[in-house]
Amino acid sequence: TGSNQHVGNFPGVTVDRKTGSIKGHPDTEITDLPGIYSMSPYSSEEIVSRNFVLDEKPSAIINIVDATNIERNLYLTMQLLEMDIPMVVAMNMMDEVLGNQGSIDVNKMESLLGVPVIPISAAKNEGVDELVDHALHIAKYQEHPLRQDFCDKSDHDGAVHRCIHAVIHLIEDHAEEAKLPVRFAATKAIEGDPLILEQLKLDQNELDMLEHIVQQMETEREVDRSAAIADMRFDFIER
């Protein structure tokens, strides 16, 4: 944005809200959300970022990933993919990766994630123009992420796979009414996310069914619900 940005606060919190327009594209507004590692409701930054994406429904997301710490950063990427919003991944600090004789297979990442992945160095302003072009393109043509099933459906993830799809079937009408992405809502409901459960407005019978489905998965996987979902994501990242 250069110097063309405004700083305010998100309603009800002291988290900065930075907005501006992209150079050469004055009609395009860009909002810089707080740096976070997940969409869990455990900090004001996470809640603000999640609410913005869910409520404002941006035309596209630029997900900036630290290429030197890719595993930790891709956890958030997977949650953003579940929101089914056009997205481009900016693989930042690629100059440091290459400087340390490292490498990242960008084409493989694009294939696995189902979205464009652009290597950049923000510090050196390398790849930024290409990133902006991709972001504007997917926003204009509403190119949503290719649908990915993060479960590998092996014996290890089979229980999680069945659980997620059973919960999707249970909540999909409620998710549509609440204007929530159903895959995201399903995984958060499994984790017991109180804010998402409140928005879904499930009746007691549906809550009981949800609990039964999740408990069955916990029994099969022999881990609790949050760990099962986290394991699914980390297993996918390790591919």
Q: Where would I find each of the regions flagged by the language model?
A:
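Conserved G1/Walker A P-loop phosphate-binding module
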Residues: 1-44, 54-56, 60, 82
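Conserved nucleotide-binding/hydrolysis micro-motifs of P-loop NTPases
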Residues: 3, 12, 35-36, 67-71, ...
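Catalytic cores of large soluble enzymes that bind and process phosphate-bearing ligands
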Residues: 7, 37, 41, 68, ...
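Helical mechanochemical/support elements of P-loop NTPase systems and associated helical scaffolds
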Residues: 11, 15-18, 29, 41, ...
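Conserved C-terminal guanine-recognition region of P-loop GTPase G domains, centered on the G4
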Residues: 20-25, 48-118
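Canonical P-loop GTPase G-domain recognition
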Residues: 95-152
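Extended helical scaffolds that flank P-loop GTPase cores
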Residues: 114, 141-239
